[in-house]
């Protein structure tokens, strides 16, 4: 854009006064909004992660991102620092000077010479006293001292709010001194965090009540508190000392109190934190769905590009392409194809919906989360107080940018998307632990030798049901519960912070579900490894016993029963190993029953041979079973022991898969162990390791490593 110099003498850095032709290019900002969604969601998440890890956040008013807000919120000043654009100083000073000059000239201006809200008909010439009273009466929050539950806003959310508020005020439309913004920056960089109440805002004339506590600290109110870098409680004097603010407490000038409190920073700051996590969780859900397809021996056809191209939705197409990339060349997929070809009737022609329609299910959720992210990024770069000081036109504009509807709406939508992701995750988890549906894995993913004394993930499934139920409840909207407030002046209000808080809860619950599910998938991977080793052992044992017992007759001649071996090995191939592995030679379990049936069927065809004991196959059945009972249990135990000692005969297929980085991270870095009733560890201990790592951001790199080779496009149709 080109800036028109003749009318923009107060805001030379702003794009308000533009030549008519340029203004007509995108006067409604729709092109800007559309451009922000170009490129893949995964590339955007990668950019967010990169921004999150930068050591400096430079504020100029218009380029703040949700990742930068999340970085400042979650890290101390020693990890990442805030720098203010010096170029913003002139515009900030111009608006501040304009307010003071207006007082001198006797200009009547809302919140400067008038009362507030429904009482704006009142007038005063005591501008500084009015700001002081504004902060006092807005300090109406309750911190709940003496109760078990905290009523204090999490310090990370407060840090996010401080950053966003600085960014708004830097744009020079609010009538506040630059020195106040520098003081808030010093608080951030020295990890001094004001204590704000958790509740009490409707985010409609902004987040008045919580923001007033930041103003209270800046003005040295006796009730104001802050926490230091180590969580120690500080009064205002000590907070200023620790932050290195040596100018003393601020005596607010006209409009400055209103500038500090009349904005949406608390709701949009928390929303930024939520969306940073939500975007990563969306990618995680795609990868976990692909791993689910691997361990369930799913048919990869569900990811075919043509299917999704014909549906047109970009989120669905990308979700399918990511899953397709994970499954392309997967050793599990190759093995599953062999299994399906060997016995096409062993499982349904089509996989169940939780697997087969996962791209269609996740795609819209990704689109919603991405759109919400862009909406919040516009909000955190907006000027959202009232009135706005337009120095260039010498006027104060009385409007309603403090209305936080973009926050409430985007957070309600995000929460619904998170609930849908959680519902899919629970459906997949339920299939995974159910031996009626999981294609040969043990019930409850039991990892021990004795399923009667090992109930695996049964407790985890109950917990997952609990998490999912709460998550579905949280999906209910907040924004349809508006109450008229402040003498019916604030008769519609956004409830933005309330919705952000509920969405933060939803993110937390989805992390609980994701942690549990990831450990379950790792368990399933190890069980497939055990299954493969045990099946090879059983086949080898059956083959050895068959050769020993069935090949030679009583007189050393070749026996007709030798032809049974091939059919017996087919039985082993087709029978689920965990259906009998705990007592392989039990007559009540399917292996022995079906091996015997092979011999019986062959004997029935051996009519003449059965008349002679030396050629009778029936006569061989008992000898075969007795010999197998001697050999097989020992060999199964040996195979288990070898695997437990890290010496399996067959390596783990996961090492040949693109999903391996996540598995390796869980097993090797976090030391989250294979679960079995034979060990002391409880499932929750292992889930906690993953949950903690997820909250610390440690899961991001292994997650993205699973997709590092993806070129951003589906496989070509050929």
Swiss-Prot record:
Cellular compartments per GO CC: cytoplasm
Location(s), subcellular: Cytoplasm
One MF annotation (Gene Ontology) recorded for this entry: phenylalanine ammonia-lyase activity
Induction per the UniProt record: Circadian-regulation with peak levels occurring at the end of the light period in flowers. Triggered by EOBI in flowers via the regulation of its promoter.
Sorted UniProt keywords: Cytoplasm, Lyase, Phenylalanine catabolism, Phenylpropanoid metabolism
A Gene Ontology BP annotation from the UniProt entry: cinnamic acid biosynthetic process
2,3-didehydroalanine (Ser) modification, residue list: 205
Gene3D superfamilies: Fumarase/aspartase (Central domain), Fumarase/aspartase (N-terminal domain), Phenylalanine ammonia-lyase 1, domain 3
Binding site for (E)-cinnamate: 262, 350, 356, 386, 458, 486, 489
Keyword 4Fe-4S part of the UniProt annotation: no
PTM section of the record: Contains an active site 4-methylidene-imidazol-5-one (MIO), which is formed autocatalytically by cyclization and dehydration of residues Ala-Ser-Gly.
EC code: 4.3.1.24
Active site: 110 (proton donor/acceptor)
Chain residue numbers at which the record places covalent cross-link 5-imidazolinone (Ala-Gly): 204-206
Activity-regulation annotation: Competitive inhibition by cinnamic acid (CA).
Catalytic activity: L-phenylalanine = (E)-cinnamate + NH4(+)
Transmembrane segments: none
Short name of any one Pfam family annotated for the protein: Lyase_aromatic
Pathway assigned in UniProt: Phenylpropanoid metabolism; trans-cinnamate biosynthesis; trans-cinnamate from L-phenylalanine: step 1/1
Function: This is a key enzyme of plant metabolism catalyzing the first reaction in the biosynthesis from L-phenylalanine of a wide variety of natural products based on the phenylpropane skeleton.
Family membership noted in the UniProt record: Belongs to the PAL/histidase family.
NCBIfam families given in the database record: phe_am_lyase
PANTHER family according to UniProt: HISTIDINE AMMONIA-LYASE (PTHR10362)
Record's subunit section: Homotetramer.
This protein's name: Phenylalanine ammonia-lyase 1
């Amino acid at each position: 854009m080109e800036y028109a110099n003749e009318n923009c003498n107060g805001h030379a850095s702003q794009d308000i006064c533009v030549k008519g032709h340029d203004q007509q290019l995108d006067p409604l900002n729709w092109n800007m909004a559309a451009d922000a969604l170009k490129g893949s969601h995964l590339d955007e998440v990668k950019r967010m992660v990169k921004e999150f890890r930068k050591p400096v956040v430079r504020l100029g008013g218009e380029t703040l991102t949700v990742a930068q807000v999340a970085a400042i919120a979650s890290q101390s000043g020693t990890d990442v620092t805030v720098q203010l654009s010096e170029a913003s100083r002139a515009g900030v000073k111009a608006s501040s000077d304009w307010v003071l000059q207006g007082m001198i000239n006797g200009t009547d201006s809302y919140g400067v010479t008038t009362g507030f809200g429904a009482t704006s008909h009142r007038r005063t010439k005591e501008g500084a006293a009015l700001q002081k009273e504004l902060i006092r009466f807005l300090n109406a929050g309750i911190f709940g001292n003496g109760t078990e539950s905290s009523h204090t806003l999490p310090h990370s959310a407060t840090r996010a709010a401080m950053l966003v508020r600085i960014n708004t005020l830097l744009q020079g439309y609010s009538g506040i001194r630059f020195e106040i913004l520098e003081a808030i920056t010093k608080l951030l960089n020295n990890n001094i965090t004001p204590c704000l109440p958790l509740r009490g805002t409707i985010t409609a004339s902004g987040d008045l009540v919580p923001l007033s506590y930041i103003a209270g600290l800046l003005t040295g109110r006796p009730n104001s508190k802050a926490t230091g870098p180590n969580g120690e409680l500080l009064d205002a004097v000590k907070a200023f000392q620790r932050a290195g603010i040596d100018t003393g407490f601020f005596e607010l000038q006209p409009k400055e109190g209103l500038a500090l409190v009349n904005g949406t920073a608390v709701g949009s700051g928390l929303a930024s934190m939520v969306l940073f996590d939500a975007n990563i969780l969306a990618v995680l859900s795609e990868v976990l769905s692909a791993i689910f397809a691997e361990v369930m021996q799913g048919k990869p056809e569900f990811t075919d590009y043509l299917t999704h191209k014909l549906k047109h939705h970009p989120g669905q197409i990308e979700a399918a392409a990511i899953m397709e990339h994970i499954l392309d060349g997967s050793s599990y997929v190759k093995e599953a194809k062999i299994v399906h070809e060997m016995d096409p009737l062993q499982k349904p022609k089509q996989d169940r919906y939780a697997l087969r329609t996962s791209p269609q299910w996740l795609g819209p959720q990704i689109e919603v989360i991405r759109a919400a992210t862009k909406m919040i990024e516009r909000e955190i770069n907006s000027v959202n107080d009232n009135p706005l000081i337009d120095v260039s036109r010498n006027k104060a504009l009385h409007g309603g940018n403090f209305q936080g509807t973009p926050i409430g709406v985007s957070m309600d939508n995000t929460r619904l998307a998170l609930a849908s992701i959680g519902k899919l995750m629970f459906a997949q988890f339920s299939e995974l632990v159910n031996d009626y549906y999981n294609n040969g894995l043990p019930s409850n993913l039991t990892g021990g030798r004795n399923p009667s004394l090992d109930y695996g993930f049964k407790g985890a499934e109950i917990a997952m049901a609990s998490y999912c139920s709460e998550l579905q409840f949280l999906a209910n909207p907040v924004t349809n519960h508006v109450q008229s407030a402040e003498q019916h002046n604030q008769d519609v209000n956004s409830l933005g912070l309330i919705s952000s808080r509920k969405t933060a809860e939803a993110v937390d619950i989805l992390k609980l579900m994701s942690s549990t599910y990831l450990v379950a998938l790792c368990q399933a991977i190890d069980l497939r490894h055990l299954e493969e080793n045990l099946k090879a052992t059983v086949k080898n044992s059956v083959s050895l016993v068959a050769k020993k017992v069935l090949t030679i007759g009583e007189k050393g001649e070749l026996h007709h029963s030798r032809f049974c071996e091939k059919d017996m090995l087919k039985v082993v191939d087709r029978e689920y190993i965990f259906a009998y592995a705990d007592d392989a030679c039990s007559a009540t379990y399917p292996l022995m029953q079906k091996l015997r049936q092979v011999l019986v069927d062959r004997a029935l065809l051996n009519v003449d041979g059965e008349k002679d004991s030396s050629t009778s196959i029936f006569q061989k059945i008992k000898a075969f079973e007795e010999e197998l009972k001697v050999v097989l249990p020992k060999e199964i135990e040996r195979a288990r022991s070898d695997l437990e000692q890290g010496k399996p005969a067959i390596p783990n297929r996961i090492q040949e898969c693109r999903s391996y980085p996540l598995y390796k991270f869980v097993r090797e870095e976090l030391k989250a162990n294979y679960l079995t009733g034979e060990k002391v560890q409880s499932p929750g201990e292992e889930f906690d390791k993953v949950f903690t790592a997820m909250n610390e951001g440690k899961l991001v790199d292994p997650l993205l490593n699973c997709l590092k080779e993806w070129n951003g496009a589906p496989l070509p149709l050929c």
